[in-house]
Structures are given as C-alpha cells and as structure tokens.
Amino acid sequence: EIPFKIFLDQWVIKNYRYPQEAVEKKIEGRVIVALRIDKKGILSIKEIIGRNPLLEEEACRIFDGFPQLSPALQRGKPVNILYNYPIVFRITE
C-alpha cells in the first residue's frame, strides 16, 4: 500500500491544471486545502484557504473523483483525520 502523502502528491500532480485565466492575469499563489478522511476512508474538503477564487476553485477541482482510501487507524480502529494540503500555483516560463 502506498503511503498516504505519496498517494496524495501523485494524485495532485496527475490532476493539476493551471487555470488559463490565472495564467493570462499572471495570478500566482498558495492554497491550503483542509481535507477530512472519515472512518470509511472517504475524503471531503472542509475548507479552502487562498487569496484568489480562480486558484481556490482549481484546488477544489483537483480532488474531484478522489478514490476511497483505507481509513487511518488508531489502536487498530478506524478514525477520522484532518490533513492540511498546500498547493502552490506558480507560473513557469
């Protein structure tokens, strides 16, 4: 089984697209996506913190269709977890 952080990174890299309007307007920034993985391993977005709606919308879209995971375990029992995931949007020439 792939560790959670590595799986998450791979998912984001695979699904990341810089919004065209943000490129045209030269908008860059960082967005924090507050994720919750419940006891069944289902991911949901609790909050998105950023300074630009275009980047926030893209950060949310990245997680569309995210597959069900194995839940986190504490003392052998499934538990809910919260995880803050930063996404940096930087235009490269």
Model-inferred region functions:
Residues 34-35, 46:
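Generic short beta-strand
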